[in-house]
Amino acid sequence: MFDVLDRIMNLDIGNRGVDKLYAPARARSTEPLCAAAARLLMTAAAGDCVIMITGSLTRPWVSTRIGETDGPVGVAALARALSYGFNAIPVVVTDTSLLEPVSACLRAAGQAVVTLEEAKRATSNRRFCSVAVTRGFPLEDNAARNEAGRMIEEFHPKAVIAVERAGMTPRGTYHNMLGQDYTQGRARIDYLVEEATKQRVATIGVGDGGNEIGMGAIVEAVHKHVPHGEILCARLATDVLLPAGVSNWGCYAIQAALAILAGKPELLHTAAMERRLIEAAANAGLVDGNTGKCESTVDGMSLEVHMGIVDLLAAAAQRAFKPTH
């Protein structure tokens, strides 16, 4: 069942070579990748924090307020499942310039964006209230290193997951899928993942291009199969790495695995929620990273394509809840 979810999330409709990254990533895991990631996230109980890193500045030479629809949408859907299913506290970390649209996605997913103190009150009360916390992050290296340590101490996260988050290369730069340097204005959130690893906090990476945090686990494959791979490959590895056709899809596969493992079909993502989230992302100013247009598409694919992937994942997962004869 989990193998099917992995295959769906890894469909390379965009023909970017990401399907060839799955095998080396899978070789690092004892089970399908969506299940491995879900098990790490399921260690979070009521009131526990999960740090979720996202936000991809796609045209920083124009403005650092222009981010992609891929990433925040998937994180919002997965954060909803962590909140609704486990009463955990998603702590979404992004560029300070993207806090507003990322928060809009979380609200569209049904979560109130609050402070950590307020989130603790919410998760300790018998009356359920779905909440999430958002934080910006420094641009400068030394400040980022200090903030990373402070955040791990403050939140004591059960896991850290980075979704569609461009990762620093060994040269300290960031590059897009064309190999272009787009380091300008980008928060150094890599140090947060690095600090989590040092403190033995479980880490997960989700990406679709080889340049995301986590892809450092399969450097040779990125160099071989991804155009400009030797230029753009991120240096950081994560405990579990999910290459996906679109990073959002990786989140939905993890969400489906969570639903199956927890025995809670109500946690599955839906096409209706997908429409709501992508439209909310565009309305908040996020753009399609491929086209640069502020409209309801992701990675050059229509809303209907993404809704179809969500339906496929749900159909596969639903079989786990049906009695066998």
For every predicted segment, state its role.
Residues S29-P32, A36, D70-V73, A77, ...:
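Conserved active-site and cofactor/substrate-binding residues in soluble primary-metabolism enzymes
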Residues A104-Y191:
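An acidic, phosphate/nucleotide-engaging active-site surface
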Residues G210-H325:
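C-terminal functional extensions of proteins
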Residues M1-C49, S56-T58:
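Positively charged, low-complexity intrinsically disordered leader regions
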Residues I89-S97:
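Short internal beta-strands
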Residues N87-A88, T197-T203:
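A short helix->loop->beta-strand "cap" motif at the edges of active sites that frequently abuts
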Residues R65-N87:
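Histidine-anchored nucleotide/phosphate-binding helix
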Residues G55-T58, R165-M168, G209:
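Short glycine-rich anion-binding loops that position phosphate/pyrophosphate groups of nucleotides
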